[in-house]
C-alpha cells in the first residue's frame, strides 16, 4: 500500500538529496516508496579566477540554501506541511578538482573545478610513476601540479577534498568521501576499497623533500555504500536552513 506522502514527511520517513551540478544545484525529496515527492533548484555558473575555472565557497552555501528553500516551498505547496527533519541526506557534486585546506580549515587556493586541465606535467609524471593512467582532472594531478609549480600554499595542505566532500564536512564534521567520488581523486584498490597503498608510498617518496605532509593524511577516508558517514550536526542544519526550522533529527548524511 502506498505511504501517505504528508505522513511520511511529518515523520521524517524521507531522504533528501542535493546535487551540485555545473550549472544547477538540484534538491529532491524521496519518500519511503522511492517516489519523488518534491524538488527544488538553484542556477549558478563558474567563473575564471587567475585563468582557472572556479566557484566561491560562499556561492556554494548560498546555492545550497536557495535550492533547499525551493524544495521546502514545493513541499508546502504540494502537501501543506513543512519538513523539519529527514531520515537521511545525500550530497553529490562535480567530481575531481581541487579544494585544499590548511590545519585551521582555511581554504588555501580558490576551488579548482573538474574543468581545469592545466595539470599536464603532473598527470604525465604520475602516470609514469604509478604505471597507471592519471587523468588531467583528477585531484592528485591538481595537487601534484601545485607542488611542481612551487605554489606558496602547497607545503601547508592539511586536507584535500572534492566539492561534495567539502559540503559533507560542513554538515557532519567528518572528512570522508564515498568510494565513487574518491576514485576521481586517487586510484582505488578494488580489493581493499581504499586508495592503492603502493601508489601512496611511491608518491610520498617522490615529494618527501618538497612538502612536510603525507598524502594518506591529506586525502579523505574512503567509505562504501552502507558505511557510517556521519550525522547532521546543529551547525550543518543551520547551514542548510538558516531559518532554524530544520532540526538534526536522526538524519544520517
Describe each model-derived feature in a short phrase:
Residues 1-7:
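A short, compositionally biased domain-edge/stem linker segment
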Residues 70-250:
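Glycine-rich phosphate-binding/catalytic subdomain of phosphoryl-transfer
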Residues 40-81, 128-131:
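N-terminal phosphate-binding loop and adjacent alpha-helix
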Residues 7-8, 18-21, 90-92:
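Short loop/turn motifs at secondary-structure junctions and domain boundaries
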Residues 10-13:
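Repeat-blade elements of multi-bladed beta-propeller folds
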Residues 15-58, 106-113:
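Short glycine-rich, Thr/Ser-proximal phosphate-binding strand/loop in the N-terminal lobe
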Amino acid at each position: 500500500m502506498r505511504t501517505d506522502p504528508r505522513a511520511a514527511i511529518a515523520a521524517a520517513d524521507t531522504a533528501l538529496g542535493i546535487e551540485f551540478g555545473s550549472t544547477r544545484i538540484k534538491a529532491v525529496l524521496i519518500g519511503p516508496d522511492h517516489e519523488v515527492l518534491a524538488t527544488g533548484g538553484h542556477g549558478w555558473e563558474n567563473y575564471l579566477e587567475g585563468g582557472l575555472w572556479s566557484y566561491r565557497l560562499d556561492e556554494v552555501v548560498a546555492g545550497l540554501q536557495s535550492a533547499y528553500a525551493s524544495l521546502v516551498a514545493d513541499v508546502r505547496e504540494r502537501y501543506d506541511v513543512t519538513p523539519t527533519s529527514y531520515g537521511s541526506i545525500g550530497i553529490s557534486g562535480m567530481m575531481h578538482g581541487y579544494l585544499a585546506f590548511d590545519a585551521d580549515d582555511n581554504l588555501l587556493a580558490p576551488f579548482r573545478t573538474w574543468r581545469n586541465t592545466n595539470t599536464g606535467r603532473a598527470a604525465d609524471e604520475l602516470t609514469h610513476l604509478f604505471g597507471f593512467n592519471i587523468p588531467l582532472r583528477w585531484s592528485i594531478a591538481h595537487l601534484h601540479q601545485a607542488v611542481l609549480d612551487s605554489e606558496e600554499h602547497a607545503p601547508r595542505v592539511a586536507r584535500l577534498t572534492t566539492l561534495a566532500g567539502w559540503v559533507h564536512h560542513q554538515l557532519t564534521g567528518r572528512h570522508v568521501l564515498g568510494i565513487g567520488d574518491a576514485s576521481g581523486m586517487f586510484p582505488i584498490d578494488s580489493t581493499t576499497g581504499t586508495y592503492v597503498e603502493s601508489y601512496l608510498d611511491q608518491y610520498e617518496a617522490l615529494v618527501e623533500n618538497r612538502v612536510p605532509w603525507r598524502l594518506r593524511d591529506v586525502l579523505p577516508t574512503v567509505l562504501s555504500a552502507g558505511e557510517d558517514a556521519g550525522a547532521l550536526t546543529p551547525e550543518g542544519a543551520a547551514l542548510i536552513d538558516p531559518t532554524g526550522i530544520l532540526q538534526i533529527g536522526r538524519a544520517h548524511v
